[in-house]
C-alpha cells in the first residue's frame, strides 16, 4: 500500500496532508522522510508529526480555573460550568470556555487552535471535548457526524414524564429570532431524542419527596429526573423537544423561565463515549453533576 493511501484511510484529509508538506520531518518512514508514493511494508515504522505554529488570533487568553476530566496529546475534555458560552461572540469576547482554554495552553507553552467537537449551550454543564490537533479534530468530527459518539445527558423537567420515550420532531429557527428554535414539521431539520425517567419528585408540605409510579397523580408541583441520548444534534434540541411534549426544563430563560427550583436550565452533559482518534481505545468520560443540579430538590 502506498503511504498516501494509508494516511487517507486513517482519516488524514487533503488539507492536513498539504499543511505537512513544507516540513521535512512531518512524515518519517523508518527514520527517513516519507513521501506519498512510498510503499509500506509489514514491520515498517511510521512517525507522524503535525506542525502547528500559530494560535487562534481572535481568542484572548483569560485566566480561569478549568476542571479537566481527561487530557492527552490529542484531546482535552473539560467539565464546562454553567453561565459560560463555549466560544466568543458579539458582546462577549473574554468570558468563554475558549478564553480559558487559550490561557491553559499558553501557560504550557503550546499553541492553541480552538477545535470544539460537541457544542454545549451557555447554561448547559458537563463534558466538552476539544481536539488538540487537526487530525484528532477531523476524526472526532467524523465520529460526531456519523453518530458514533454516544452522548448521555441528565436533565430535570417539569411534571412526571412517561417511563421512557422517543421524540421525533423536526426543529427549525423561530421566525423573527436568531436564537430561539421551535418544532417545524415543514422546514425543520430531523431531530430525534431518546429519554428515560430515572426518578420523580413532588412537593408535599413544602418539601420535595420521591414519587413512585404507583403514586403518580396530579401533583401541584412535580419534576422528573431524566437521562437522554441524542440521535441528532440540533441547536437547543433537548430543550425544544421536552417543551414540545409538555415537560419543559425549569429555569430555561428562552423556553420556560420558571426559576422556582433552579436559576438556569438543569441540563448536564453527563457522559461521552467515543473511540480515541489515535489509539482507537474506547473512551468513556463522565462529568460529575454540579451542585445546583443535585440540590434542586433540597
Spans of features found by a protein language model:
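RNA pseudouridine synthases
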Residues: 1-298
Amino acid at each position: 500500500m502506498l503511504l498516501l493511501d494509508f494516511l487517507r484511510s486513517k482519516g488524514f484529509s487533503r488539507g492536513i496532508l498539504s499543511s505537512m508538506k513544507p516540513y521535512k520531518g512531518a512524515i518519517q518512514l523508518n527514520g527517513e522522510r516519507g513521501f506519498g508514493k512510498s510503499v509500506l511494508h509489514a514491520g515498517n515504522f511510521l512517525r507522524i508529526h503535525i506542525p502547528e505554529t500559530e494560535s487562534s488570533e481572535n481568542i484572548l487568553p483569560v485566566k480561569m480555573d478549568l476542571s479537566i476530566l481527561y487530557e492527552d496529546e490529542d484531546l482535552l475534555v473539560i467539565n464546562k460550568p454553567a453561565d459560560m458560552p463555549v466560544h466568543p461572540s458579539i458582546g462577549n469576547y473574554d468570558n468563554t470556555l475558549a478564553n480559558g482554554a487559550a490561557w491553559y495552553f499558553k501557560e504550557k507553552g503550546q499553541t492553541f487552535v480552538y477545535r470544539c467537537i460537541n457544542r454545549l449551550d451557555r447554561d448547559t454543564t458537563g463534558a466538552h471535548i476539544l481536539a488538540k490537533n487537526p487530525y484528532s479534530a477531523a476524526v472526532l468530527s467524523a465520529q460526531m457526524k456519523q453518530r458514533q459518539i454516544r452522548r448521555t445527558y441528565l436533565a430535570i423537567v417539569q411534571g412526571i414524564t412517561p417511563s421512557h420515550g422517543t421524540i421525533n420532531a423536526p426543529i427549525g429557527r423561530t421566525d423573527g429570532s436568531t436564537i430561539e428554535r421551535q418544532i417545524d414539521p415543514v422546514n425543520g431539520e430531523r431531530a430525534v431524542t431518546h429519554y428515560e425517567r430515572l426518578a420523580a419528585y413532588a412537593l408535599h408540605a413544602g418539601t420535595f419527596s420521591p414519587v413512585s409510579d404507583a403514586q403518580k397523580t396530579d401533583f401541584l408541583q412535580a419534576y422528573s429526573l431524566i437521562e437522554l441520548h441524542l440521535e441528532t444534534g440540533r441547536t437547543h434540541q433537548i430543550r425544544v423537544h421536552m417543551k414540545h411534549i409538555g415537560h419543559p426544563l425549569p429555569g430555561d430563560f428562552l423556553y420556560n423561565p420558571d426559576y422556582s427550583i433552579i436559576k438556569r436550565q438543569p441540563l448536564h452533559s453527563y457522559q461521552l463515549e467515543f473511540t480515541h482518534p489515535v489509539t482507537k481505545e474506547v473512551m468513556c468520560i463522565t462529568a460529575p453533576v454540579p451542585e445546583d443540579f443535585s440540590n434542586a430538590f433540597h
